[in-house]
Amino acid sequence: MQDMMGGFFGLELPEYGNFPYPESTCCAYVNSGRAAFECLLQNMPWPERIWIPRFICDTVLQAPQRLRIPVERYGINEQLQPELPPAGRNDLVLLVNYFGLSDLSEAAAQLRGRCIVDATTALYTPPLPGVPTFYSPRKFCGVPDGGVACAPFPLHQLPENTGSSSRHSLHLLQRLEEGAESALAASEAAEHQLDNRAGRMSRLTRQLLGSIDFSAAAERRLRNYHTLHQALGCINRLNLPASPGHAPMCYPLICGIPGLRDALIDAGIALPLYWPEVIGQSTACTTENKLARSLLPLPLDQRYSFSDMERLSRLILE
């Protein structure tokens, strides 16, 4: 529908047009990462089971549960690499690219096409050849909704949403005007709304994604990663690449310094726990439990400069 000419002004957004995954018949724009996962499952041969790692957010289980696909769980090692399960020829395996730093090419080759890649924390890593992959731009930039499903075959689109994303965009404006802490409750409410409705990506999110310079954001993320790794690589128990091939979501640090998480939070560094439900579902000796308790996802995104990374490194090392 053509918009009205004249009248009050709306948001005036630049148009960079370099979002990594343009919409196409094989790339569906939906309103969340879990909706993108569901979109892929609906467009693939129905599996007898799907294997999902234990080290993952519980929301990923919503899609197979809604589609009544039986779920089995499998483990990963201490370097965030999959320990492939005994999947049958009619099973699917969900591989997770953790923070954009996992190399899944060998695992995908072993599975011979019986896999989907969860790249919700790996926006800048393109799909492996022939492997369906889904993304969550909301973890990388300020948009109210959004998920992307990419496949080596045409995808049937989800239905249009009946509501407007403006109702769950409040947290973005609130953070801008009042700060992050004031917007936490609104952010959690917006997340809950996305749990209950799968549909297409909103017009607002499409416009906002077009207004972000993703190339510049990727360069900033890589520079910040290099700064952190140069300072912290010597204490990090994770064997991370010195120069990752694609821009990561964060710098995952495991170092065993007592009280470090609380000290950083007290210093104003937001450190989400990936993932708290894993701790309650596993014993203390499991790899997943240890990762959930000890992994510190240090922020390195496009909002921050070299001096910010130096300050963060000093807080940890001093």
Language-model features and meaning:
Residues D3, G7-C27, A35-Q110, R114, ...:
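PLP-dependent aminotransferase-like
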Residues D3-G10, G17, Y21-A28, G33, ...:
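PLP-dependent aminotransferase class I/II
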Residues I56, G75-Q81, A119-A122, P137-C141, ...:
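Short, acidic/turn-prone active-site loops that include or flank metal/cofactor-
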Residues L80-P85, Y124-G130, G142-A149, S282-C285:
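Short, charged, surface-exposed secondary-structure boundary motifs
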Residues P85, A107, T125, S243, ...:
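Short secondary-structure boundary/capping segments
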Residues C115-I116, T133:
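A short alpha->loop->secondary-structure connector
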Residues G130-R175:
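Active-site PLP attachment segment
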